[in-house]
């Protein structure tokens, strides 16, 4: 009932011309592949999509292996502790020398596919989303060192 209620609010916002950001999987990924599984929120919204609304898929690559990901431990990092460590790393690296990672963000209009697969059902729709997110293949974790003055890679 909660998901249906939220989906209705999102559909009404789209009908009113507002932009809405949805994260279909609703969680951090457990691997280098996105897994939508049996989630239903995005499917419910796209199944009732107002005629003039557009769906823009956003694929992000380069974050798997960051201190915010589950790549190292398999568990979600503690937000407060990770945030404090991040502040320490910025200060310890004299702000300008923080090791950086290449992050790619790709936006693509996937309206036609979402409308088509939403009409076919939740599972085909979710498989379509997974195929979009995972099109480049499985992302390998990249563990960067946290201090510019330490030799080697990883942490």
Identify the role of each PLM range.
Residues 4-8, 43, 126, 130:
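Generic alpha-helical structural signal
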Residues 8-12, 44-47, 134:
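Surface-exposed alpha-helical segments enriched in charged/polar residues
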Residues 2-5, 37-38, 124:
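Soluble or luminal CAZymes and related metallo-dependent hydrolases
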Residues 1-18:
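Membrane-interfacial amphipathic helices and adjacent loop/beta segments
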Residues 26:
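Active-site metal-binding loops of divalent metal-dependent hydrolases
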């Amino acid at each position: 009932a909660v998901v249906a209620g939220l989906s209705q609010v999102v559909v009404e916002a789209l009908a009113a011309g507002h932009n809405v950001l949805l994260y279909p999987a609703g969680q951090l990924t457990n691997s280098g592949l996105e897994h939508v599984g049996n989630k239903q929120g995005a499917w419910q919204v796209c199944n009732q999509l107002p005629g003039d609304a557009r769906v823009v898929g956003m694929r992000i690559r380069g974050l798997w292996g960051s201190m915010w990901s589950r790549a190292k431990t398999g568990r979600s990092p503690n937000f407060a502790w990770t945030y404090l460590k991040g502040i320490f790393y910025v200060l310890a690296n004299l702000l300008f020398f923080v090791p950086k990672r290449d992050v790619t963000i790709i936006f693509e209009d996937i309206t036609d596919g979402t409308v088509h697969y939403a009409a076919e059902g939740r599972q085909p729709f979710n498989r379509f989303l997974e195929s979009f997110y995972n099109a480049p293949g499985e992302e390998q974790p990249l563990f960067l060192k946290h201090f510019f003055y330490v030799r080697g890679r990883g942490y």
